[in-house]
Amino acid sequence: MSMQTAPIKKTTLNHLQAKKNQEKIIAITAYDALFAQIFDPLVDVILVGDSLNMSFFNQNDTLSASVEMMLYHTKAVCAGAKTPFIITDMPFGSYKDEKTALKNAIRVYKETQASAIKLEGGKEKAKLVKTLTDEGVIVVGHIGLMPQFVRLDGGYKIKGKNEEQQKKLLEDALSLEEAGVGLLVLEGITTPIAQKITQKIKIPTIGIGSGKDCDGQILVWSDMLGFFDSFKPKFVREYLKGKELVQNAIKQYADDVKKGNFPNELESYH
């Protein structure tokens, strides 16, 4: 009699929403199958972020990321990670109106195994969110510092420093929740208003640079593993000197090749 392995339990939106006020949600970015497979057993959520345009393609911002790019990398991540809840960023310009947003969101669902899509914007996106959720698409919201608005904002600026911004952020969060977003990313928001939003809404918040009171946290993997030393945001904690470790390994490899120590007899065929 053949032994059957237990089916892999995929993290769902219900699982994540059940963690609200109970257990912190662990999220990280990934852009390929290799790292997705490494992260798989350790995280609840993987975001295929348009941040790949900066960390993977060395561009200055996220704005030139395309739908095709996001689909390609989402397919790779889904091939490597089987259990986390996988979110695909909708890139700049891909949800400019309801027709365009529906077309691109449906492509994500048809062409990948992504669990949800994420879009940036506040209460002005509420109608769009409802349209998408009415079609069966799980939408993750994103407010605060929104990278797709970096040129309009004149840079990456922390939000929630004054009463007007705080009021808008809370209104945005409540409107998006009512419209049907399943999770809400809070980026670059001052801690007090991030805490207030987290307390006021019933869906989980996932913070990045928004203090410890959010229901979960997310970081760009190459930031937290120390692969970029040219610029490190205040909110990033490095858990590894990845760039240094990799460079040292390559140096050892190069040295072995130059000295004729690689390959040796055990690494050769006869």
From Swiss-Prot:
Its EC number is 2.1.2.11. 3-methyl-2-oxobutanoate binds at residues 50-51, 89, 118. Its cofactor is Mg(2+). Binds 1 Mg(2+) ion per subunit. Keywords: Cytoplasm, Magnesium, Metal-binding, Pantothenate biosynthesis, Transferase. SUPFAM superfamilies: Phosphoenolpyruvate/pyruvate domain. Gene3D superfamilies: Phosphoenolpyruvate-binding domains. Its main location: cytoplasm. It is found in: Cytoplasm. InterPro entries: Pantoate_hydroxy_MeTrfase, Pyrv/PenolPyrv_kinase-like_dom, Pyrv_kinase-like_dom_sf. GO terms for biological process: pantothenate biosynthetic process. It is an enzyme of class 2 (transferase). Mg(2+) binds at residues 50, 89, 120. Belongs to the PanB family. Homodecamer; pentamer of dimers. This is 3-methyl-2-oxobutanoate hydroxymethyltransferase. It comes from Helicobacter pylori (strain P12). The gene is panB.
